[in-house]
């Protein structure tokens, strides 16, 4: 992926729209640039640049007010005014306020702080290239389109239009108040200008909106203030529906607050309600694996995203065998795209099913949702989807009948690797050579085990006790075979995978940590697996690396071969706590939470580089990591849930707390509005010396609290 770094961009998202701009508020996209205004995998605005007197203003500050609003303060550069008189630098204060919702709203306020009259021109350059996100990412070569777009004038602005190879007309409609002069530069570029004439301390204000449109559809127009009120109300509704976490650390409180707001911003409209998009800017789309794992991570916060994710993925479940899309009956989607290339069939993503783990994760999430909500009505409606998913695991998943689930890509346009580490070079032998398929990933066997155990409980609730007993028998057989075939005694951990010849892929990786999470690890080996994960070649001080630094394929700057992923570490910490390894879980959680505290935005990115932690230095960012990213934003909530030992059994009206622990810098955590079934609870966790206790503060409903401190 050859794209610009995005760490310093202004990023906003609301609904279907998101914008990535420079910190001065300009959008100046070029090849392989993430900058732009996007909707449905299409860049509807590739340039939005402000000049005053023909020069770009000087940035002063940028503040993100919320995931959908930002304020940029600027000052003019030295200019020549009317009659050639000089306008000194910083004579004009320029404020650009961005608001994103059903369209992009921008308000520009210019105030004259010089002692004399200022007269010059204000201009905004606009362009729309309608690039597909796969072109922007560099995932495919740029598509030649002729004509690229057509520009037209409307009553209060301009519109750009383009008919794609999918025969869909896409438009970008720009409306301006007060009306400016429109200058058409080319087929896909225009300039709006206003004459600026300000006496000392006088101000000028202009507003404009940019609305992406498909086939002429338009959203109702709102004023800037009215739009802000709508989005603020939606944000408050989300916050009120979530559990509240208060703690004694101001830094951690900021991390948690940022996570809650980022997760809300990533909720994206679909036919099934709002579902979680994976991350901005590259993955604002439905990803099965990402949505499911994020839903699991945030069950303590709210179970509602899990319900919507299950309903959405069940509706999109594959019903036919389609090699181009790596689809087979019962399989859960990997990625759903809605841009020109996907709709026209140029790429197989409408949807694409190249994920080996999304299907068992679908079942795991269903079971977890059941335990948190006891919502049998929703789950019974999805029963046919569960049946189909289990059938996929046992037939298409287990390709050769050896009891393990494997993958082998059949699509010439799809992914070569189908686990969460899906980059081309991520599944390698210790000598760095790529493993040949079919590949049986270590963590996927754990997912299948946990899926069958969880579905056995759910099927009993459905009244299908014989099916439940069969699933338990299958899970028990898998545990035995797994621990025999995947174990590497000389490394005291499990192999990354089995290759197509059933040989171990003997690389030491983070993947076995997911096996702790699933419970497939033999109890006598859990400590060994934990110790191996925390050796210096795996644990950097900022978290567990994806691949051992002793591997020939190790690269701390790579995507999957030595980097550190917060969600990966959250799952590992949950697995460690599952086996009673509280101090090891605390070590992992502390590292990741301290990385979050180091972030200037109190936000965990998708991943960061795997370099060793050094005194006085922060982690090294991965330059094109998504930020915000769903499963990274949700990771702190899973970490806290694991450390505090919280598990729910809503069908039994029970919430259990087992051996809670808190990090060194945290002495107190209060949870409020925690939902278990139809009940709500508030809990206090207090640490004194080395012991952490839990007390019930308040509750509604019949839920019982079980304490094992």
Q: Where in this protein do the model-derived segments appear?
A:
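An extended acidic
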Residues: 1-91, 100-103, 115-117, 129-135, ...
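Extended glycan-interaction surfaces of carbohydrate-active proteins
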Residues: 71-76, 246-286, 311-353, 399-440, ...
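Acidic/polar, glycine-enriched structural segments that form the non-catalytic walls/loops
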Residues: 92, 103-105, 112-285, 376-380, ...
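Extended, well-ordered alpha-helical scaffold segments
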Residues: 220-234, 251-258, 302-316, 375-394, ...
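Beta-rich accessory regions
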Residues: 113, 119, 197-199, 205, ...
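Edge strands and adjacent loops of beta-rich recognition modules
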Residues: 67-92, 174, 659-685
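Aromatic-rich carbohydrate-recognition surfaces in CAZymes
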Residues: 284-416, 442-445, 449, 505, ...
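Catalytic cores of secreted or luminal carbohydrate-active enzymes
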Residues: 625-667
